[in-house]
């Protein structure tokens, strides 16, 4: 009998595939149903963000950051405003720092709910998504009440935040903090010991701690490998130095551990949100420097200088002293960094964006080799790719 030879063949996964999480085109080399190579093709959502920023004032460039990782927009804004503030050398009022920290965690929950539930949906569990999006709706409502927008907030500004929160919003967030752990318990009851969910995630996409560090992984992907690295602890910014929270880590670096880390992080986010509200100081929410922050309506009605400051700020912007900085924050997906270069004018000379999803997507080949075709879906879900920030 003649021996049959199985030839490897190529399969295009996406960009129309619902589990591609956007516009991912993955060229897979398969031997039967086993993956020999996974080659991500990116750029289908490239909009030239970094170049566009060079033609805008520092204030006009801010909304571009909401449109990068549109699943956790305020984290991206935070990195940019911290970079601008560092170059300007201005101090942010304590209340603004606490409000930023609070909404950083609100945004982290928005992202983690989306990620954990859609990953479960991708591998066959529909119920968590239906539970999760009900809770996520409350969080998007908090964002809307604070900034006026559910997604593209543009609420963080150089020098503070755009406006103070409504009086009853903090009470409502505190009530949410009381009810939210029940949702986490329900999802964990559905998934943690679910035989099918564990078969689809345990020992799938394993990465060792050393491999994760070599590839530059950050966030839940790195912490899932057992490395307790979190910029909120190691390089605290705004009010994080005053917060008491733990860094959840995994042990095996597989899809299941990455899921567990994200679930545990949601409980830590609730802890941080409570502390922010309990310790929230009174006072202004933006620096009192009208060359950088706009004056109030009341001031403009009585002061000609205030009116001039307002007009100049929104037409010409402010000049930033010459210099450069790399400023990073712990976004929901990992280390989101902004390398900002100023040449002393009112526009950035260069703005390089370091997006965690871009780095994690490079590791998809490492995670997928030797696994089955169906496991690619679990891997993509567990690294949490968002193409707004990958393609920029």
Curated annotation (Swiss-Prot):
Q: Which Pfam families match?
A: Complex1_49kDa
For this protein, the record's InterPro entries field holds: NADH_Q_OxRdtase_suD, NADH_UbQ_OxRdtase_49kDa_CS, NDH1_su_D/H, NiFe-Hase_large
Q: Which domain of life is it from?
A: Bacteria
Matches recorded under PROSITE patterns? COMPLEX1_49K (PS00535)
> Localized where?
Cell inner membrane
Tell me, in one coarse class, where this protein mainly resides: membrane
Q: What is its EC number?
A: 7.1.1.-
- Please write the reaction equations for the catalytic activity of this protein: a quinone + NADH + 5 H(+)(in) = a quinol + NAD(+) + 4 H(+)(out)
Quaternary structure per UniProt?
Answer: NDH-1 is composed of 14 different subunits. Subunits NuoB, C, D, E, F, and G constitute the peripheral sector of the complex.
Q: Which family does it belong to?
A: Belongs to the complex I 49 kDa subunit family.
- Protein task: NDH-1 shuttles electrons from NADH, via FMN and iron-sulfur (Fe-S) centers, to quinones in the respiratory chain. The immediate electron acceptor for the enzyme in this species is believed to be ubiquinone. Couples the redox reaction to proton translocation (for every two electrons transferred, four hydrogen ions are translocated across the cytoplasmic membrane), and thus conserves the redox energy in a proton gradient.
Q: Which HAMAP family match?
A: NDH1_NuoD (MF_01358)
The name under which this protein is listed is NADH-quinone oxidoreductase subunit D
Protein's organism: Rhodospirillum rubrum (strain ATCC 11170 / ATH 1.1.1 / DSM 467 / LMG 4362 / NCIMB 8255 / S1)
Taxonomic classification, please?
Answer: Bacteria, Pseudomonadati, Pseudomonadota, Alphaproteobacteria, Rhodospirillales
């Amino acid at each position: 009998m003649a021996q049959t030879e199985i030839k490897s063949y190529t399969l295009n996964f996406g960009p129309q595939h619902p589990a591609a999480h956007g516009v991912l085109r993955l060229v897979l080399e398969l031997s039967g149903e086993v993956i020999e190579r996974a080659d991500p093709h990116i750029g289908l959502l490239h909009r030239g963000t970094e170049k566009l920023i060079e033609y805008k004032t520092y204030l006009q460039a801010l909304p571009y950051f909401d449109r990068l990782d549109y699943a956790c927009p305020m984290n991206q804004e935070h990195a940019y405003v911290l970079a601008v503030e560092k170059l300007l050398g201005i101090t942010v009022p304590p209340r603004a720092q606490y409000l930023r920290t609070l909404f950083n965690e609100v945004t982290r929950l928005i992202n983690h709910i989306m990620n954990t539930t859609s990953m479960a949906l991708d591998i066959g569990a529909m119920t968590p998504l239906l539970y999760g999006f009900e809770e996520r709706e409350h969080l998007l409502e908090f964002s809307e009440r604070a900034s006026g927008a559910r997604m593209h907030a543009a609420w963080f500004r150089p020098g503070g935040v755009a406006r103070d929160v409504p009086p009853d919003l903090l009470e409502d967030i505190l009530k949410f903090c009381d009810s939210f752990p029940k949702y986490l318990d329900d999802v964990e009851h559905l998934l943690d010991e679910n035989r099918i969910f564990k078969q689809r995630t345990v020992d799938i996409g394993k990465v060792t701690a050393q491999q994760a560090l070599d590839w530059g992984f950050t966030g839940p992907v790195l912490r899932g490998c057992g490395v307790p690295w979190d910029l909120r602890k190691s390089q605290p910014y705004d009010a994080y130095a005053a917060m008491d929270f733990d860094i959840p880590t995994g042990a095996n670096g597989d899809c299941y551990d990455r899921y567990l880390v994200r679930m545990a992080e949601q409980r830590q986010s609730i802890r941080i949100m409570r502390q922010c509200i309990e310790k929230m100081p009174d006072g202004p929410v933006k620096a009192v420097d009208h060359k950088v922050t706009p004056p109030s309506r009341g001031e403009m009605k009585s002061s000609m200088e205030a009116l001039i400051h307002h007009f100049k700020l929104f037409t010409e912007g402010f000049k930033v002293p010459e210099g450069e900085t790399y400023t990073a924050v712990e976004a929901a997906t990992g280390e989101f960094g902004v390398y900002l270069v100023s040449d002393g004018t009112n526009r950035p000379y260069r703005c390089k964006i370091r997006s965690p999803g871009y780095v994690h997507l490079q590791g998809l080949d490492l995670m997928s080799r030797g696994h089955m075709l169906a496991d690619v879906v679990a891997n993509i879900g567990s690294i949490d790719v968002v193409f707004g920030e990958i393609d920029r």
